[in-house]
Every structure is written in structure tokens, then in C-alpha cells.
């Protein structure tokens, strides 16, 4: 039985099925989250998830069940339950450092440290850029460009680990470029 992180059946998860270490088939869970293995004989059965339906992450460890001769002779059933968690989400928020108002148009580079994920995102009018269902990994988030009149801080990189089911937020703040206004008047206008 394949369940999601809320204990509801999860259809469409694909598993390799092994008996005593030998591949005997590949099956997908049905609408009720189940795979039924028929003609079972005594031995160790291992279920290795090959793919999980979006937005879930596949299991990183196999699920095992031993079927003994008493179960086979008695026509019994062995139930194995596997539970998936959703892939993580990341919200990047950009604020003006002085007035804390959102800043639209900031471009961020997101790099997965271990598995090669890479994407650039731009903050919207609410100052946010949202990444949904991204791989479980540690990420470096770096500001690439900012709209005028803000000052780019190229050393402003934040690192975050996103685990299964996480919904995290990073906040970046920038100062505006200082402005100097010079007014030229003649001596008669003092």
C-alpha cells in the first residue's frame, strides 16, 4: 500500500519488485495505492520505488517483507506500507532594508549543492519568487541583479537545506543607492 504524507492512498508510484534479490517485475500502484503480487512463494520480497507521482519524492530506501511458508500454505496476506512525502517548496522574499516594502524585479540564482539543480527566478510585485516541488537538497541562493535604485550585494548568498515536505522561506534585504541632488541657482535667486 502506497500512502501520501496525509495517509491517503497514492496511485501512480512505480516499484521494482524483487524476490530474494532477483527482479520479478515492475508495477505501478493502482487508484487505491496498492500493488498486488500473485503466486507468492516463501522468501524475502523487496519493493524499490523507481518513480513517485508529482509532487512527491520517491522513497530513498527499499521496503521489505518476508513471506514464510505458513503464510503461503494458509493463503494469508502480507501487507507492506510505504509512505511518500511531498517535494519541498522554497519562497524567496526581497525587501527594502529601510522600509521593509517588497522589491519586485530582483533576479536570484538557485543552485542545488549535491544534485545539479539550477534555476534563475525573478521576484514578482509582492517581492516573492516561489519554487514548488523542487528536489530534496541543500541550496545556495544568490542575488544576481536588482532593480534601480538598489545596490547589488554579490556576497549575499544564503544556504538552506530543503527536506521532504518542507515549505521554507528566505528573506533578502537591500539598501537603495544613495542619491545626491545638487541645485544650481544664480546669486540673484538666493
Where are the model-predicted features located?
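Solvent-exposed loop/turn and edge beta-strand elements of beta-rich ligand-binding domains
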Residues: 1-190
Amino acid at each position: 500500500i502506497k500512502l501520501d504524507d496525509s495517509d491517503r492512498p497514492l496511485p501512480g508510484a512505480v516499484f521494482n519488485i524483487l524476490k530474494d534479490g532477483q527482479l520479478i517485475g515492475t508495477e505501478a500502484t493502482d487508484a487505491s495505492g496498492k500493488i498486488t503480487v500473485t503466486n507468492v512463494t516463501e522468501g524475502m520480497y523487496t519493493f524499490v520505488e523507481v518513480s513517485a507521482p508529482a509532487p512527491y519524492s520517491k522513497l530513498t530506501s527499499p521496503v521489505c517483507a518476508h513471506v514464510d511458508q505458513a503464510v503461503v500454505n494458509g493463503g494469508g496476506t502480507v501487507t507492506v506500507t510505504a509512505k511518500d512525502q511531498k517535494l519541498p517548496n522554497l519562497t524567496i522574499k526581497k525587501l527594502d532594508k529601510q522600509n521593509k516594502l517588497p522589491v519586485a524585479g530582483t533576479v536570484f540564482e538557485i543552485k542545488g549543492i549535491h544534485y545539479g539543480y539550477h534555476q534563475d527566478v525573478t521576484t514578482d510585485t509582492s517581492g516573492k519568487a516561489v519554487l514548488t516541488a523542487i528536489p530534496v537538497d541543500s541550496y545556495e541562493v544568490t542575488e544576481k541583479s536588482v532593480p534601480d535604485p538598489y545596490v547589488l550585494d554579490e556576497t549575499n548568498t544564503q544556504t538552506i537545506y530543503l527536506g521532504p515536505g518542507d515549505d521554507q522561506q528566505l528573506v533578502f534585504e537591500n539598501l537603495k543607492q544613495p542619491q545626491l541632488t545638487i541645485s544650481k541657482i544664480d546669486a540673484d535667486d538666493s
